[in-house]
Regions:
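AMP-binding/adenylate-forming catalytic core of the ANL superfamily
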Residues: 240, 268-359
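Conserved C-terminal "lid"/linker of ANL adenylate-forming enzymes
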Residues: 287, 314, 326-328, 348-399
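Conserved ATP/PPi-binding loop(s) of AMP-dependent carboxylate-activating enzymes
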Residues: 222, 231-256, 260-261, 282, ...
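ATP-dependent adenylate-forming carboxylate-activation enzymes
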Residues: 6-10, 32-40, 123-145, 294-299
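Conserved AMP-binding A3 loop
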Residues: 58-88, 92-95
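Conserved pre-ATP/AMP-binding loop-to-beta segment of ANL
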Residues: 11, 47-64, 96-99
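AMP-binding/adenylate-forming
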Residues: 27-28, 78-88, 99-166, 204
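Gly/Ser/Thr-rich phosphate-binding loop
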Residues: 167-219
């Protein structure tokens, strides 16, 4: 099986390769980030006896996962049928095909799908300016796209939370000029979607992953292509034609029930009274402190309810409790010692009031910027390094 490797940084080549792959599909394709040495080596090091997912005639798109909690990304094999199934379901959910503005990296499924959706709609994708996202530059791209697109053709984009926040703060007209804005990549602060709604922007929260060809649940409702259920352990399972065929160099994680393939996610969820899916955390978000289970995502949400900016809850080893909750808090200013202590105590009390003593943070540290991945997710590995560095420097509040 020949594998074509294309660097995501060469965006024009990546777009052309993706479109050719969708319509021709004669070669297995992988669009990789510049720093993806490990995935590249794994693909290039494929031995002659390596099993081919889907058989000799299958030429999948191989996409590396973007999770922030694993050192080794999975190499996900997606068939053209899976990608097209997802694209069609998105088109149906949004009210019809349209033109897409690509702001996200083409090494990630969210960025890739903007190209796929545009291509199958008969439109070329519009590439936003490269480099660090700038809301005003993005607004200019939207304005130019609107001017060059027929009024009858909807204009869409996909963003992550930090990009949405930047647009709300600096270029809200970019959001209101679009017919729909998909926002995924992890937890989306409800205050952001509320602000977007107040200015008349249509923002849709998406849930999905590389293994499901991208978002397959919009605002808590599964797309037509997706079937979602909650296992007895509270973990979300997903089925549908948009599922991957397997991992490139790992055993398949898919299970089968009555001939139906199911993917067991790493997310916890529940179905609300109105039938929507609510994500309550990740499996690895659940820790034990003093024998009591604590959901780190719930800790973050409680801290946000106090008006804190971006926060990251982590578990640190504790000689008494086994583990305790630590909070890394992002602030624009440089707080004084007394301000740090006051804020830390308020955060601890707020979380304790919401979730109980075991969830109350025993370590709180402040930073100008919480580290993020290229897709806008908190990089928990770097965040842990950051909070440990602050502790060693004596610059963290501890109880």
């Amino acid at each position: 099986m020949a594998i074509q490797l294309v660097p995501a940084s060469d965006r024009s080549s990546a777009v052309n390769a993706l479109i050719k792959h969708i319509f021709d599909g004669e070669t297995t394709l992988a669009v990789l980030a510049e720093d993806s040495g490990q995935p590249s080596n794994r693909l290039l090091g494929r031995g002659p006896n390596h099993p081919i997912v889907g058989g000799e005639q299958c030429h999948p798109l191989i996409v590396a996962t973007s999770g922030s909690t694993t050192e080794k990304p999975h190499l996900v094999c997606l068939t053209t049928e899976a990608l097209l199934s997802s694209a069609q379901a998105t088109s149906d959910a949004l009210g019809g095909p349209g033109r897409w503005i690509t702001t996200l990296p083409l090494s990630h499924i969210a960025g890739i799908q903007t190209v796929v959706r545009a291509a199958v709609s008969g439109h070329s994708p519009i590439l936003a300016p490269p480099g660090h996202f700038n809301a005003k530059d993005f607004a200019r791209t939207v304005r130019e796209a609107r001017e060059s697109t027929l009024p009858s053709v909807p204009l869409y984009t996909s963003l992550v939370s930090p990009q949405l926040a930047a647009c709300l703060d600096h270029a809200p007209e970019a959001l209101t000029s679009l017919d729909s804005v998909l926002v995924g990549g992890g937890f989306v602060d409800p205050s952001l979607t509320e602000r977007a709604e107040r200015i008349g922007a249509r923002v849709i929260r998406t849930y999905g992953m590389t293994e499901t060809s991208g978002g397959c649940v919009y605002d808590g409702i599964p797309l037509d292509c997706a079937t979602v259920k909650i296992g007895s352990d509270g973990i979300i399972l997903i089925a549908g034609p948009m599922l991957m065929s397997g991992y490139f160099d790992e055993p398949t994680p898919l299970s089968y029930e009555d001939g139906q393939a199911w993917f067991k996610t790493s997310d916890l969820g529940e179905t609300t009274e109105d039938g929507t899916l609510k994500i309550t955390g990740r499996v690895d978000d659940i820790i034990k402190s003093g024998g009591v289970k604590v959901n780190l995502r719930a800790v973050e949400e409680a801290a946000l309810s106090l008006g804190a900016g971006m926060v990251c809850a982590l578990a640190l080893p504790d000689p008494t409790w086994g583990q305790h909750v630590a909070l890394l808090v992002e602030r624009d200013d440089v707080p004084t010692l007394s301000q740090k202590e006051k804020c830390a105590r308020e955060l601890r009390e707020a979380v304790r009031d919401y979730l109980g003593d075991a969830a109350a943070p025993r370590t709180v540290a402040f930073t100008r910027q919480i580290p993020l991945t290229s897709l806008g997710k908190v990089d928990r590995t770097l965040a842990r390094q950051q909070i440990n560095d602050l502790i060693r420097q004596g610059d963290a509040w501890r109880r």
